[in-house]
Amino acid sequence: MKTIQEQLPNDLVEEILCRVPATSLRRLRSTCKAWNRLFKGDRILASKHFEKSAKQFRSLSLRNDYRIFPISFNLHGNSPSLELKSELIDPHSKNSAAPFEISRVIHCEGLLLCSSQLDESRVVVWNPLTGETRWIRTGDFRQKGRSFDVGYYYQKDKRSWIKSYKLLCYYRGTKYFEIYDFDSDSWRILDDIIAPRGSIGYSELSVSLKGNTYWFAKGVTEERPRTISLLKFDFYTEKSVPVLLPYQSRRLFQASSLSVVREDKLSVLLQLDQSSKTEIWVTNVIDETTKGAVSWTKVLALDLSPHLQIGNDGSFFLGEDKKVVMFCEKLIDENKVKDMVYIVGEDNVVTEVGFGVDEMDGCRAVILNYVPSLVQIERAGGNRKRGH
């Protein structure tokens, strides 16, 4: 007797499987070899699954001891709390005599780009759900202090449009940029991606949304040469365009931060000055066909106490109902630095929760959105494997 899978056309089976959440399908793959073959080595199908499946939105934290943990928030009741789950350890670092100490993480649709301020000779792109990794050598550069971002563009394949990934490497506050192509396994220098007087040294934060990278930048528009705006880098054109903020003529913010909402919108945290409310804005739409066309909606305006200091590099994200926001910041007390998460709602009541370890050294702790996916990491030359 034929199994159900054998009785159904492959196209229909694929369509059904593409509706199953990634974590559930991951378990099913281990019990059905035929279903496992549908996804193993098929980047197009894995990408199609990400576009059509129900998303499972999770949270991750990078602690100041260079370790990544899933984190869950309990926002019900009168005492909000958080819980750190088991540490995520990529296979290479777990078995290596010299572990890779991650100090910066960028999330891009289920993939994590991890870099280290202690070892800038390499970065790793990692899918925590599947365990797949790709280590990339970054070469010898003039000085330390580089940042790396990941994104993609679509290119035509024999069967469909597929995502092709790239890395962007840069020194903040300079005009030096390089780009890495996953398929060709090569780096090259980029010129003129920002305005002559522009700078992305304003903040260390960046986020990835729909394949593009966003930063805070200064001096990137001719009309407002000294003001702060958002800058979007397009990995297809390899150019950047300014994206106007809700406040378009500011030379300085008391606090500013970036986040992504449910993988389809940008969110910014802005505080104009020390006496102003802390505002959370979310994009309604970002017009991909015109330069910087965007509209914003203010979803929260918080009147925080002066002792709660939010800087330009602290991370945050919104709760699903956009009524609660979580900030991650450092609390400096004498000779100790502790990572804190502040949970704040519309009532302005602040819940402080410490996590991580008390250390003066270490990386900046962050919290970030994460969506488990079966997206496969592009190998050099298409499907060819290569060593690390």
From Swiss-Prot:
Pfam family membership, one: F-box
SMART domains: FBOX
InterPro entries xref list: F-box-assoc_dom_typ1 (IPR006527), F-box-assoc_interact_dom (IPR017451), F-box-like_dom_sf (IPR036047), F-box_dom (IPR001810), Gal_Oxase/kelch_b-propeller (IPR011043), SCF_F-box_component (IPR050796)
Residue ranges of domain F-box in the record: 2-48
CDD domains to which the protein is assigned, alphabetical: F-box_AtFBW1-like (cd22157)
Additional observations: Double knock-down mutants of ETP1 and ETP2 show an accumulation of EIN2 protein and a constitutive ethylene response.
Free-text function comment from the UniProt entry: Negative regulator of EIN2 protein stability.
Name under which the protein is recorded: F-box protein ETP2
Gene that encodes it: ETP2
